[in-house]
Amino acid sequence: MATVLFQKTNERYTDQNEVSAFLASRGVLYEQWDVSKLPAELVDTYTLTDADKQTILDTFQSEITDVSERRGYQTADIISLSDATPNLDELLVNFQKEHHHTDDEVRFIVSGHGVFAIQDDEVGYYNIELNPGDLISVPVNTRHYFTLQEDRKVVAVRIFVTTDGWVPIYEKDPIETAN
């Protein structure tokens, strides 16, 4: 279950009703999907073959189809990051640059953990700390960045409006990220 950490105050929301209400008030879609149906051999597996990735997509196809039909998404893929990922640190540098997209940024956490830090005019930056089973959709044109938690591992389903995939728009100088 996700938590929300406010970077300015270090206040943290852990109650799921509070988390859901806050994210909804910011236009962030938040859902929880059942990860217990993931095949046992893929739980906490971060080096994935193409067949493994397809198995994950197939396992969650009904959920992917449901959210896609509701929100106009067209395609999905799998990203897996861990210390075994070539050039992990360079990838994280790109993800940690503040950016936005011309479509929603949708992620479902299958294994591991991730953090989306979202810029908000009212509360400043807040971190959405994601765990297995959490799905979020960062709204179009919302400034944010992504990083990993201390375990430096995540497997996520990425869902896109177009087949262009992840297309960041950088407009500002890099910011110092806070976890």
Curated annotation (Swiss-Prot):
One of its GO terms (molecular function) is acireductone dioxygenase [iron(II)-requiring] activity. Pathway: Amino-acid biosynthesis; L-methionine biosynthesis via salvage pathway; L-methionine from S-methyl-5-thio-alpha-D-ribose 1-phosphate: step 5/6. Its EC number is 1.13.11.54, 1.13.11.53. The record marks 107 as: Important to generate the dianion. CDD domains: cupin_ARD. The record marks 98 as: May play a role in metal incorporation in vivo. Transmembrane segments: none annotated. Binds 1 Fe(2+) cation per monomer. Fe(2+) binds at residues 99, 101, 105, 144. It catalyses: 1,2-dihydroxy-5-(methylsulfanyl)pent-1-en-3-one + O2 = 3-(methylsulfanyl)propanoate + CO + formate + 2 H(+); 1,2-dihydroxy-5-(methylsulfanyl)pent-1-en-3-one + O2 = 4-methylsulfanyl-2-oxobutanoate + formate + 2 H(+). Ni(2+) binds at residues 99, 101, 105, 144. SUPFAM superfamilies: RmlC-like cupins. The record marks 104 as: May play a role in transmitting local conformational changes. Its cofactor is Fe(2+); Ni(2+). Keywords: Amino-acid biosynthesis, Dioxygenase, Iron, Metal-binding, Methionine biosynthesis, Nickel, Oxidoreductase. Gene3D superfamilies: Jelly Rolls. One of its GO terms (biological process) is L-methionine salvage from methylthioadenosine. It comes from the Bacteria. Belongs to the acireductone dioxygenase (ARD) family. Catalyzes 2 different reactions between oxygen and the acireductone 1,2-dihydroxy-3-keto-5-methylthiopentene (DHK-MTPene) depending upon the metal bound in the active site. Fe-containing acireductone dioxygenase (Fe-ARD) produces formate and 2-keto-4-methylthiobutyrate (KMTB), the alpha-ketoacid precursor of methionine in the methionine recycle pathway. Ni-containing acireductone dioxygenase (Ni-ARD) produces methylthiopropionate, carbon monoxide and formate, and does not lie on the methionine recycle pathway. Monomer. This is Acireductone dioxygenase. It comes from Exiguobacterium sibiricum (strain DSM 17290 / CCUG 55495 / CIP 109462 / JCM 13490 / 255-15). The gene is mtnD.
